[in-house]
Amino acid sequence: MNYTNAEFELAYEEILKRILFDKIPVQNPIAYILGGQPGAGKTQLQKIIFRKNKNVIAINADAYRQSHPRFESIQDEFGDDSPKYTQPFINEIVERLISDLSDMKYNLIIEGTLRTADVPLN
């Protein structure tokens, strides 16, 4: 499902504002890359990281899915298949967050299945 650049920018800025709420950049940022199949323990590792360092931003693609400008209509039309229609938007959001937050020197947790190495390596 298509979205305009303006819609993307609006959604991106809202997400960015929300995740930066209580975080500060650091001189030497750390990126934690957690990958594995569902049930592998990624969420538990994330909790351990947060206990040790509260100044970390977790990048979680599923948390941004509802920010798609057509999320509700996609849900209504496609139901359980809706994630494949919102995935291009999510990919763009995640890639931009990783790039921008890395440039701004924030600590990050990047979680996913790591089906490909493209996003983490970039």
Question: Predicted regions: what is each one?
Answer:
Residues 21-29, 101-102:
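Phosphate-binding P-loop
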Residues 1-23:
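N-terminal pre-Walker A segment at the start of P-loop NTPase domains
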Residues 54-122:
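Conserved nucleotide-sensing/catalytic segment adjacent to the nucleotide-binding pocket
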Residues 45:
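Hydrophobic positions on the alpha1 helix immediately C-terminal to the Walker A/P-loop
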Residues 48:
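Active-site signature of alpha/beta-hydrolase-fold catalytic machinery across serine-
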Residues 37-38:
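The conserved Walker
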Residues 32-33:
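Short hydrophobic/aromatic beta-strand immediately N-terminal to the Walker A/P-loop
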Residues 42:
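Conserved lysine of the Walker
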